Amino acid sequence: MIYDNNQIISLAKKFRKAIDKAYNNGDFDGDICFKHFPRGCCGDTCYLLATYLYEKGVESLYVCGNFGMQSHAWLVLKDKRVSEPAPKFRIPSDEENRLIEMFGGKKYDKPVDITKYEESNIENGIIVDLTADQFGEVPVFVGYIDGFHKEFEFDFAHEMDYVLEGRLVELYNIVYNYL
């Protein structure tokens, strides 16, 4: 399904509202991170929101940036505004293979895919950020890159791994109960 920006805003606000309800009801008091929501929760929130959006048919990328000693993470919708990175492969060096084998891995004798997203691939994408209020910004931001997100030096972006197990599943289920 293809969503317009207003529908994405609606989904993002609904999900943030569910997080806020769970937080205010004390459902996160036992969680090492979410008991301080939104402070320090941007990465985990990205995984939770990406899972919710994926269930609605919306794919996203996880983006991380740094500003001084601070880091921040947000999603970029994976749609026609985002360009796919050019495929890159390389053969690990003998030293890398030695280290891999030393830690119980198997030596690579074929090229390894090292394709990754660069800032230029995502610069025209739509950002979805539910935790910028930890920096005094709006609690739900959906839009093109703004002054706040430009402050963060691009570190990396990758395809989302969706919540499948562990602590994040528990958090997702808590939030989902408030949707």
Cite the ranges covered by each PLM segment:
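A structural boundary/capping signal
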Residues: 1-179
